[in-house]
Swiss-Prot record:
A single BP term in Gene Ontology: mismatch repair
GO cellular component, one term: cytosol
Keyword check for DNA damage: yes
Record's protein name: DNA mismatch repair protein MutS
Family: Belongs to the DNA mismatch repair MutS family.
Gene3D superfamilies assigned: 1.10.1420.10, DNA repair protein MutS, domain I (3.40.1170.10), MutS, connector domain (3.30.420.110), P-loop containing nucleotide triphosphate hydrolases (3.40.50.300)
GO molecular-function terms, A-Z: ATP binding; ATP-dependent DNA damage sensor activity; damaged DNA binding; mismatched DNA binding
Length: 851
């Protein structure tokens, strides 16, 4: 678009826009933020606002769109949610006093990863992630700008990087190196991330001091540089950098967490129906965030787990005190977010009042915790800093009825500042003085309807109608003439008016200065406030887990070093909550020291997947320190959980169900140790029957012989149950059924041994398929069951056909032709017992080429 004959104001816009080409520029002009040129056209479509033009009569009018400054945040939120950046340019001087073009500067760049203010506040974290690469390992740092949380780690490969980004649910990733086109596609198209780039490392190392690798230091430094560059201010609320290792937590991929519905239901993408939903009896926003973090990252340290358990047990044993604690926590606001608003210079009077109300609750919370009289709880008590001096400052300084905005006045309490009280007295008494003057002049002049009015142009004046002009005293002076009246002033009235105007102006200015001073004082307490926030969040999560344990009759799990799993009458905690205790059928799970694999058979809808998820959730709950849904639980400490439960194509990256299965299986067998838990449901169903069966067997054997992880493998391939005769650490279990008078009842109970039938047609019957179709399926099943297992049935004609007709519909693999001989030789050369699953898959594909 041609940009000729540009006015000075528009030239200023273009100069600023040049520095922010990848962002929408909101350009403050009076009471509006304006957008121009391409920004205006695009924003009008995205925000559904009017598109107009500047200099409409010009040859090339400039597209323009705008939003009111007081409601701009909701429009910014929309753009950020859509994955865009927004640069906010403010007027840096009073337009009335400006000479020439009003000075404007960008004061903040808001991006999906740096949101602090929002018209729709969310208690969840919003992480900005930075990734760097040194040619060998990846450094990954993340920060929540709204809370100050700041962490860093290093990772071995891009798959781990991708998984960690997904686990953090980041919306923006900052890169300090060039990604391959494939990796960019994964991040942008598959994970819907905004990619930003930063090459400069933040110079001040004070925030990133510590024992870090070079690549970790670089990632953290570039993250800091980007945040300072976009926020354009010192961020006093940023917390000390925390180094963490993935191995210090129970490792789970994003796919595993999703399949287990840990923080949201995978089908609805809502919190309801997730483990997070079940366990959330928190009372604070900080507690909600910490609970989610505990679910995301269960512990592997037995000592740390037992410490949490002990406090939960203490809370469970003291119902009255715990109830008082929960009620007190309801009065605690989001200290972390309030601290960040103070740091950003955006805290308003309501924010400080919320901080004050929170601090007023802290002594009560501390006293309740002391009343538990427990050494483990005393550690929390000792970490609680009540900050009484800050609470006193806010309570005595800020009026409890103060408005949300600073400009409205009435912020500071009466009695806090003598000068402010004086000005307020002048304004308050000035109204009485004016009433006295009005009464006096009415009596002395004899003008019965004489009154004093006010407007911005003339100030205070006497209103005299034309019929009374002859009675106007000599000391009155004319201020304005109207059609039917005159406006007059007096020296006395002018003096009072001057005093009142001075008091109003001085009061407004002084009150603003006092508030700024108080906010600056609050900022000096940010580090102590953040430590208090962490302690209160921990207390909140622990009381939440105690409430959930009591409500749902959970028990305290035990841990062993013998690699034994014992779960008596265990329940899937979330399913039980949804169904109700009376409806749910519990199942025991047992792995002795020798057993590493349970091969579970049984029909769909019978409860195999629920059984596997039950074990995973029990492990996760136990290792996050929670009590669990069972009569008795004794577990080893797991280092990782790998799952493949439920079929799902990866449509965005174009990967089929089978490919996704193989990739997840690959991750499991490569990364799992003998301290891991593997849960595979119907692995191999995404390909031809024999391909799938061969791969399933090869994977089972590989896990058995080389990995040694505790594994539950659910399958419809009943032939695999024979593996128990040669794999000493594999046992068969099945879902029990009851057959009576041709009807089948799924008992949803796990029993020893293999299933004798799959009951697929019965499941179809439950699903309501037509009777004629079910009858035909019975015929086909009967015929198939009479055939040799080595023969793949391509089609089975209805009713009874000759055996020759059947053979005509079969594919012969072992005929006398030359190609069949070649295939037979290839098959005989395969060493099945020593093949990896992926060697098996490759071999099968090569065999297919020979057909």
């Amino acid at each position: 678009m041609t940009k000729t004959n540009i006015s000075p104001g528009m030239q200023q816009y273009l100069d600023i826009k040049k520095d922010y080409p990848d962002a929408f520029l909101l350009f403050r002009m009076g009471d509006f933020y304006e957008l121009f040129y391409e920004d205006a056209v695009k924003a009008a479509q995205l925000l559904e606002i009017g598109l107009t033009s500047r200099n409409k009569n010009a040859e090339n009018p400039i597209p323009m769109a705008g939003v009111p400054h007081h409601s701009a945040q909701q429009y910014i939120d929309v753009l950020i949610e859509l994955g865009y950046k927004v640069a906010v340019a403010e007027q840096m001087e009073d337009p009335k006093q400006a000479v020439g073009v009003v000075k404007r500067e960008v004061v903040q760049v808001i991006t999906p990863g740096t949101v602090v203010d929002s018209a729709k506040p969310d208690s969840a974290n919003n992480f900005l992630v930075a990734v760097d690469f040194d040619g060998c390992r990846y450094g990954l740092a993340y920060m929540d700008v709204s809370t100050g949380e700041f962490c860093v780690t290093d990772l071995a490969d891009f798959t781990s990087v991708r998984s960690e980004i997904q686990n953090l649910k980041a919306k923006e990733v900052l890169l300090g190196f060039d990604l391959s086109e494939e990796e960019q596609t994964i991040l942008v198209k598959q994970m819907n991330l905004l990619l930003s780039y930063e090459e400069t490392v933040y110079e001040d190392k004070s925030l990133i001091d510590g024992q870090l690798t070079t690549v970790e230091l670089t990632a953290a430094g570039k993250l800091l540089q980007y945040v300072h560059k976009t926020q354009m201010r010192e961020l006093s609320h940023l917390q000390a950098l925390v180094h963490y290792e993935i191995k210090d937590y129970l490792q789970m991929s994003y796919a595993t967490k999703s399949s287990l519905d840990l923080v949201e239901n995978a089908r609805t993408n809502k919190k309801h129906g997730s483990l997070y939903w079940l366990l959330d009896e928190t009372k604070t926003a900080m507690g909600m965030r910490l609970l989610r973090s505990w679910i995301d990252r269960p512990l592997v340290s037995k000592e740390a787990i037992l410490e949490r358990q002990e406090i939960i047990q203490v809370f469970l044993n003291a119902f009255i005190e715990r109830t008082d604690l929960s009620n007190s926590l309801k009065g605690v606001y989001d200290i972390e977010r309030l601290s960040s608003r103070v740091s950003f210079g955006k805290a308003n009077p309501k924010d400080l009042l919320q901080l004050g109300y929170t601090l007023a609750q802290v002594p009560y919370i501390k006293a309740i915790l002391e009343s538990f009289d427990s050494p483990c709880v005393d550690k929390l008590v000792n970490d609680i800093d009540s900050l009484p001096e800050l609470e006193y400052l806010i309570r005595t300084a800020i009026d409890p009825d103060a408005p949300a905005t600073i400009s409205e006045g009435s912020i500071i309490r009466t009695g806090f500042d003598e000068r402010l009280d004086h000005y307020r007295k002048v304004m308050r008494e000035g109204t009485g003085w004016i009433a006295d003057i009005e009464a006096k002049e009415r009596q002395e002049s004899g003008i019965n309807n004489l009154k004093i009015d006010y407007n911005k142009k003339d100030g205070y004046y006497f209103h005299v109608t034309n019929s009374n002009l002859s009675l106007v005293p000599e000391h009155f002076f004319r201020k304005a003439t109207l059609k039917n009246s005159e406006r007059y002033g007096t020296a006395e009235l002018a003096k009072i008016e001057g005093q009142m105007l001075e008091a109003r102006e001085e009061s407004s200015s002084l009150e603003y200065d006092i508030f700024m001073c108080i906010r600056a004082q609050v900022e000096t307490y940010i580090n102590r406030l953040q430590k208090l926030a962490k302690t209160l969040a921990t207390v909140d999560v622990l009381q939440s887990l105690a409430v959930v344990a009591e409500t749902n009759h959970y028990i305290r799990p035990q841990f062993n070093d013998n690699h034994v799993i014992t779960i008596q009458e265990g329940r899937h905690a979330v399913v039980e909550k949804v169904m109700g205790v009376q409806e749910y059928i519990p199942n025991s799970i047992s792995f002795d020291q020798q057993t590493s694999i349970q091969l579970i058979t049984g029909p769909n809808m019978s409860g195999k997947s629920t059984y596997m998820r039950q074990l995973a959730l029990t492990v996760i709950m136990a290792q996050m320190g929670s009590f669990v849904a069972a009569d008795h639980v004794d577990l080893p400490l797991f280092d990782a959980i790998f799952t493949r439960i439920g079929a799902a194509d990866d449509l965005i990256s174009g990967q089929s169900t089978f490919m996704v299965e193989m990739m997840e299986a690959n991750q499991a067998i490569k990364r799992a140790s003998d301290n891991s838990l593997i849960l595979f449901d119907e692995l191999g169903r995404g390909t031809a029957t024999y391909d799938g069966m061969a791969l399933a067997q090869a994977i089972i054997e590989y896990i058995h012989d080389r990995v040694g992880a505790k594994t539950i493998f659910a399958t419809h391939y009943h032939e695999l149950t024979d593996l128990s005769t040669k794999l000493t650490s594999l046992v068969n279990v099945h879902v029990a059924t009851l057959e009576k008078d041709g009807d089948v009842t799924f008992l949803h109970k796990i029993a020893e041994g293999p299933a004798d039938k799959s009951y697929g047609i019965h499941v179809a019957k439950i699903a309501g398929l037509p009777k004629s179709l079910l009858k035909r399926a019975d015929e086909v099943l009967t015929r198939l069951e009479t055939q040799s297992r080595s023969t793949e049935i391509m089609s089975v004609p209805p009713q009874v056909e000759s055996s020759s007709a059947v053979r005509q519909g079969q594919l012969s693999l072992f005929g006398d032709d030359e190609k069949a001989h070649e295939i037979r030789q290839a098959l005989e050369a395969i060493d099945v017992m020593n093949m990896t699953p992926f060697q098996a898959m490759t071999t099968l594909y090569e065999l297919k080429k020979l057909l």
